C-alpha cells in the first residue's frame, strides 16, 4: 500500500510534463515573427485585449513570406511546396520553421522564402528564378494542375495568402485561402502554370508608424516570359508542355510584383472576417440559419423530454401503488394458471418486477459483459475528449486561430481521458460483479473482500485500449500517405512522441484511475438491496415461460430506429464541419459555439431515448429471454445506432459530394471517417447504457426499499 502515493506523484508529474509540452507546441508558432517585439501602448492594449497581440510595422521593415504546401479538395494528399520539382528552391540562408504539433498533423511544411517584401514599398516587377526541371517534373506539374491543387502561403505569422472573389448574394468581398497552381483551358484541355503572382498586401494604420497587416491577396497570372503583366491582359500565357525526350530540360520563369494598400474599414481584430462564411450566405443570414437549426433541435429535444417526463412520473409515482405484480406461475405440466390467462396482463404488468428480474435473474455472457464495459469506457473517454476540448476552446473567444486550440485541447483531453475511462470501467466492473456474485456468498465479509479485488490489466485495458487502437490505425494509414511522399504523413519524431505519451502518460493514468475507483466504496444501497437468496421462491419474482431464445427483428428495428433522432440534431453542424474539413480545405469552421450546443443537445436526446427505449423493452419484451439476458447490450445499442447513421451520411458525403480521385485518397477518407464515427457511436452508446442502467437500477432499488 505504500507504493500508491509514489504512483500518484509519478502520474501527476507526467501530466504536468505533457501539458507543458503541448503548451510549448501550441505557442511556438506564435513567437515567430519578423524578429521585433511590438511595443504596445496602453490605448492599444485596450484595443487588442486578447491572448494574441499584433505585430506592428513601420515603413521599410522587412516582412517574411512563408511558403507552406499545396493541397487539393479532390485528394487527401498535400505536398510540401519546396519538395515539388518545378518550384524555385530556397537559397542557402533560408531555413525551415519550427512546426507545432497542430501544424504537423495538418501536414504543414513551412519555409522561409526568397520573396523580398518591405513594408509600404511597392515593387512592380521582380524575377524570382528560372526553374530548371525535367520531363518527370513537368508531368508532375501537369498532374497537380489537373487535380486542382492550390498553393498555401503565409505572412505575418499566420495570415494566409488568399484568392479574392465577390459574393453573388451580398456583393461583398470574401477570401478563400490559397491560390490555384494553374488552370485548365476548358476548350482545348491544355494546362497552364501560374508562374507570376501579384501580391497585394493590405494594412491598417492604427497609430503613427504603427501599422498592422489585415489582408494578403494573391492574383496569379500565367506568363510565357519574365515580364510582369500588371493589370494588362495582352500577354501570352505559359502552357505546360511535357517534352518527349527524357533528358530534355525545361526552364520555368517565375516573377512577382508587390503592392501595398491601406485598409480603412477592417482592423486587425477583424482581419479573419473575410475568410468566414465564404459568401454563400450573408453574415446575418448564416447566424440566423444556425439559430433556426438550433431551435429545431431544441424543439425535438423538448418533445422527447415531455415523453420522458411522463414515463418517469408514471414509473416512479403512479405505478408505485401497483408495485406488486400478478404472479405468472407455471406448473410441472406447463399448463398456465388462471392469472396467466388474463388478456390484459401486458398492459398491467409492473416494470418493478421486470427490473428485478433483469438485474437478479439475467444470465449475461461474462466475456460479453467485460467487452461491454470496455466499450462503455471507450465511449466515456471520447465524450470527455469532445466536450472538454470544445468547452475550453469556446472559452478562448479572443484567440484568433481557434483551429489550433481545438486540436491541441482534443489531444490533451484524449490523453487525460484515460483516467476517466479506467475509473468508469472499474466502477462498472465492481457493480456488475456485486450483482453477479452476491448470492454465492454466505459470509458478507468474504463477499466484500472479493468484489473489491483489483484487476490492473482490465483497468489498463479500459483506459489505454482506445488510444492504442487509434494510434495503431493512424500509423497504418500513415504508411499509405508516406508511400505517396505527402506532407500529411507523420514524421518519425512525431510518432515517437505519441508513443512516448502513450506509455508514459496513458498507461499510468489508466492504472491510477482504476486504483481511485477501487478505493471508493460502493453506496450502501447497492449492497443492501441485493439479497443473499436471489431465487424467485418467494412468489414475487417473474417466472418466464420456458421458450427457446430466438432473434426478434422488431426489437432490433426499434433499437436502430432510435439513431435517426440524434442525426437530426447534429446534421446541420456535420454539414458545415465536413465542408470545412473535406470539401473546401481552404475555408474555416468557426461555429464552435453552435457545435458545442448541438453536442449537448445530442447527449441529452440520447439519454432521453435510452430511458424511453428501456421502458418500452420492460413493458413489451419482458418474456423475451434474449432481452432479459442482454438488456445491457440493448441499451448500449440504442445510443450506438446514432453513430451508425453518422457513418452512413459520411459515406454518402465521400462518394456523392466530395468527388475524391484516387484509391488511396478514398481509402484514407473512409478509414478516418470510420474511426471517428465509431468513436461517436461508442460515446453515444456509453451515454445510453449509463442512463438506462441508472433508470433500471433506480426502479429496482425503489422497489426494494418499499
From Swiss-Prot:
Q: List the ranges whose topology is Lumenal.
A: 34-290, 393-405, 478-494, 575-592, 659-665
Q: Which residues form the signal peptide?
A: 1-33
In its keyword annotation, does this UniProt entry include Nucleotide-binding?
A: no
How is this protein situated with respect to the membrane? Multi-pass membrane protein
Location of the protein in the cell: Golgi apparatus membrane
Task: Mention any one GO cellular component term assigned to this protein in its UniProt record.
Answer: Golgi membrane
Side of membrane Cytoplasmic, spans:
312-371, 427-456, 516-553, 614-637, 687-706
The transmembrane segments are: 291-311, 372-392, 406-426, 457-477, 495-515, 554-574, 593-613, 638-658, 666-686
Name one process (GO BP) from the record: vacuolar transport
Q: Which UniProt keywords apply?
A: Golgi apparatus, Ion transport, Membrane, Signal, Transmembrane, Transmembrane helix, Transport
Pfam families in the record, alphabetically? EMP70
Alphabetical list of InterPro entries matching this protein: EMP70
Functional note: With EMP70 and TMN2, plays a critical role in the late stages of a nutrient-controlled pathway notably regulating FLO11 gene expression. Acts downstream of RAS2 and TOR. Essential for cell adhesion and filamentous growth. May play a role as effector of cellular copper homeostasis.
Homology family = Belongs to the nonaspanin (TM9SF) (TC 9.A.2) family.
Name recorded for this polypeptide:
Transmembrane 9 superfamily member 3
Lineage of this protein's species?
Answer: Eukaryota, Fungi, Dikarya, Ascomycota, Saccharomycotina
The gene that this protein is the product of is TMN3
Amino acid at each position: 500500500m505504500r507504493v500508491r502515493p509514489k504512483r500518484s506523484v509519478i502520474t501527476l508529474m507526467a501530466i504536468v510534463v505533457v501539458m507543458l509540452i503541448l503548451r510549448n507546441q501550441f505557442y511556438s508558432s506564435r513567437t515567430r515573427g519578423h524578429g521585433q517585439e511590438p511595443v504596445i501602448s496602453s490605448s492599444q492594449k485596450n484595443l487588442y485585449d486578447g491572448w494574441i497581440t499584433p505585430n506592428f510595422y513601420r515603413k521599410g521593415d522587412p516582412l517574411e513570406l512563408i511558403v507552406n504546401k499545396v493541397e487539393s479538395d479532390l485528394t487527401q494528399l498535400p505536398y510540401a511546396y519546396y519538395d515539388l520539382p518545378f518550384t524555385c528552391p530556397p537559397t542557402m540562408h533560408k531555413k525551415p520553421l519550427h512546426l507545432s504539433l497542430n501544424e504537423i498533423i495538418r501536414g504543414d511544411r513551412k519555409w522561409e522564402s526568397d520573396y523580398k517584401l518591405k513594408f509600404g514599398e511597392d515593387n512592380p516587377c521582380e524575377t524570382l528564378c528560372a526553374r530548371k526541371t525535367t520531363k518527370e517534373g513537368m508531368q508532375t506539374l501537369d498532374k497537380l494542375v489537373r487535380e486542382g491543387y492550390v498553393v498555401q502561403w503565409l505572412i505575418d505569422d499566420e495570415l494566409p495568402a488568399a484568392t479574392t472573389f465577390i459574393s453573388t448574394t451580398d456583393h461583398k468581398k470574401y477570401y478563400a485561402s490559397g491560390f490555384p497552381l494553374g488552370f485548365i483551358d476548358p476548350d482545348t484541355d491544355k494546362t497552364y502554370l501560374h508562374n507570376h503572382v501579384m501580391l497585394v498586401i493590405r494594412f491598417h494604420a492604427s497609430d503613427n508608424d504603427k501599422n498592422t497587416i489585415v489582408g494578403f491577396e494573391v492574383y496569379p497570372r500565367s506568363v510565357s516570359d519574365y515580364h510582369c503583366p500588371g493589370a494588362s491582359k495582352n500577354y501570352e500565357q505559359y502552357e505546360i508542355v511535357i517534352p518527349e525526350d527524357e533528358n530534355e530540360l525545361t526552364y520555368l520563369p517565375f516573377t512577382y510584383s508587390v503592392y501595398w494598400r491601406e485598409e480603412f474599414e477592417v482592423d486587425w481584430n477583424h482581419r479573419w472576417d473575410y475568410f468566414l462564411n465564404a459568401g454563400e450566405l450573408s453574415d446575418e443570414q448564416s447566424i440566423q440559419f444556425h439559430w433556426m437549426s438550433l431551435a429545431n433541435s431544441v424543439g425535438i429535444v423538448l418533445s422527447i423530454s415531455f415523453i420522458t417526463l411522463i414515463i418517469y412520473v408514471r414509473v416512479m409515482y403512479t405505478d408505485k401503488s401497483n408495485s406488486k405484480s400478478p404472479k405468472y406461475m407455471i406448473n410441472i405440466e406447463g399448463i398456465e394458471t388462471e392469472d396467466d390467462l388474463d388478456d390484459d396482463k401486458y398492459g398491467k404488468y409492473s416494470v418493478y418486477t421486470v427490473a428485478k428480474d433483469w438485474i437478479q435473474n439475467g444470465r449475461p455472457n461474462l466475456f460479453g459483459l467485460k467487452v461491454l464495459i470496455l466499450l462503455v469506457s471507450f465511449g466515456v473517454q471520447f465524450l470527455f475528449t469532445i466536450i472538454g476540448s470544445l468547452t475550453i476552446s469556446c472559452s478562448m473567444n479572443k484567440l484568433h486561430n481557434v483551429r489550433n486550440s481545438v486540436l491541441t485541447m482534443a489531444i490533451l483531453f484524449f490523453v487525460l481521458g484515460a483516467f476517466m475511462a479506467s475509473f468508469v470501467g472499474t466502477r462498472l466492473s465492481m457493480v456488475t460483479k456485486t450483482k453477479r456474485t452476491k448470492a454465492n456468498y454466505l459470509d458478507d465479509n468474504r463477499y466484500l473482500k472479493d468484489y473489491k479485488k483489483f484487476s490492473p490489466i482490465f483497468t489498463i485495458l479500459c483506459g489505454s485500449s482506445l488510444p492504442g487502437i487509434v494510434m495503431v490505425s493512424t500509423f497504418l494509414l500513415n504508411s499509405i500517405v508516406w508511400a505517396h511522399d505527402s506532407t500529411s504523413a507523420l514524421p518519425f519524431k512525431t510518432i515517437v512522441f505519441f508513443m512516448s505519451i502513450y506509455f508514459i502518460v496513458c498507461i499510468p493514468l489508466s492504472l491510477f484511475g482504476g486504483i481511485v475507483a477501487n478505493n471508493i466504496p460502493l453506496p450502501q444501497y447497492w449492497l443492501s438491496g441485493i439479497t443473499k437468496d436471489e431465487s424467485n421462491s418467494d412468489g414475487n419474482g417473474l417466472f418466464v415461460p420456458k421458450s427457446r431464445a430466438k432473434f426478434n427483428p422488431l426489437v432490433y428495428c426499434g433499437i436502430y430506429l432510435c439513431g435517426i433522432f440524434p442525426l437530426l440534431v447534429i446534421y446541420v453542424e456535420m454539414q458545415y464541419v465536413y465542408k470545412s474539413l473535406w470539401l473546401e480545405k481552404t475555408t474555416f469552421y468557426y461555429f464552435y459555439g453552435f457545435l458545442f450546443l448541438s453536442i449537448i443537445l445530442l447527449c441529452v436526446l440520447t439519454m432521453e431515448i435510452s430511458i424511453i427505449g428501456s421502458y418500452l423493452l420492460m413493458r413489451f419484451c419482458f418474456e423475451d429471454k434474449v432481452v432479459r439476458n442482454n438488456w445491457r447490450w440493448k441499451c448500449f445499442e440504442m445510443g450506438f445506432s446514432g453513430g451508425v447513421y453518422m457513418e452512413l451520411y459520411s459515406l454518402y458525403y465521400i462518394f456523392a459530394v466530395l468527388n475524391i480521385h484516387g484509391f488511396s485518397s478514398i481509402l484514407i477518407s473512409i478509414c478516418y471517417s470510420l474511426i471517428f464515427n465509431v468513436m461517436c457511436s461508442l460515446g453515444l452508446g456509453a451515454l445510453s447504457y449509463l442512463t438506462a442502467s441508472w433508470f433500471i437500477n433506480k426502479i429496482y432499488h425503489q422497489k426494494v426499499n418499499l
